[in-house]
Amino acid sequence: MLEAMAEPSPEDPPPTLKPETQPPEKRRRTIEDFNKFCSFVLAYAGYIPPSKGAPDSATLLEKMKLKDSLFDLDGPKVASPLSPTSLTSRPPAALTPVPLSQGDLSQPRKKDRKNRKLGPGGGAGFGVLRRPRPAPGDGEKRSRIKKSKKRKLKKADRGDRLPPPGPPRAPPSDTDSEEEEEEEEEEDDEEETTVVGGGGVPAPVLPTPPEAPRPPVTVHPEGAPPTDSEGKDAGSTETSQDGDGSSSEGEMRVMDEDIMVESGDDSWDLITCYCRKPFAGRPMIECSLCGTWIHLSCAKIKKTNVPDFFYCQKCKELRPEARRLGGLPKSGEP
């Protein structure tokens, strides 16, 4: 019985000792580690100057935080001995960003932007710790202001030259991200390149002047046309030849004329060429001897190379000397 009673006695003290020793040790370690981690993160982010030469002040602040936490937990019993220390410790505790450390860990970039907006002394309990940070923030704001001024000047110059391509954009605010600014700068560069490229576009090449007067000289008959229908044929050929610059373009236009021109005109169905096909709006040339009108395609003549004097196949067979001389026959000859 004595042995049985003596066995539980050594088992009882370990469970009573464990809760007494372990909880305060765990609590102390977690708070210290958390404070060190927060101070490291804040110093790395630039909110707090790195504490290189004053390690004692950091340890004192940690002790003051522990006393404040104990004072809040215990109640009014510990208030009387810790009243002077609590008064002195509360301002630094308010200045320390312990409650904001979780937000800093999750979203450090957003806090950087907020600090740029607020500037030095923007927050109530956060201004003293951000005193070493105002210089880079001011430099960034100044650079942004300079960029916005340059953009406004560029837009004003572009407004004088070109109309606005779309609805007016809102002025850039401080809340815009750096990526948006880079995109806007790229757009500005592209617009400048388009403006410069648009000014250097070459003018469309016009047809050469010597080619234009050739068709009317050759197509128009020297004397009066034999009939009114032939005069109409000459006028139509003149307009078609003046508008065309090459044989391929002339053929396309002839096809268009065949489709578009009405067939009510008398000259449209007139047959004068030895191919026994009507005028049909195609360019023709008059023989210098007999005065008959023949299609250029039937005579194998290009519009760009129309001769001054043309002789049809019949005249060439009957009067070969006219071809050798290259001029009109004498008036006495038939």
Curated annotation (Swiss-Prot):
Stretches with biased composition (Pro residues): 162-171, 204-218
Origin species: Rattus norvegicus (Rat)
GO process terms (BP): autophagy; negative regulation of autophagosome assembly; negative regulation of autophagosome maturation; positive regulation of protein ubiquitination
Modification Phosphoserine occurs at: 57, 80, 83, 246-248, 331
UniProt KW Acetylation keyword: yes
Molecular-function GO terms, alphabetical: zinc ion binding
Sequence ranges of Low complexity compositional bias: 80-92, 236-249
The protein's name: PHD finger protein 23
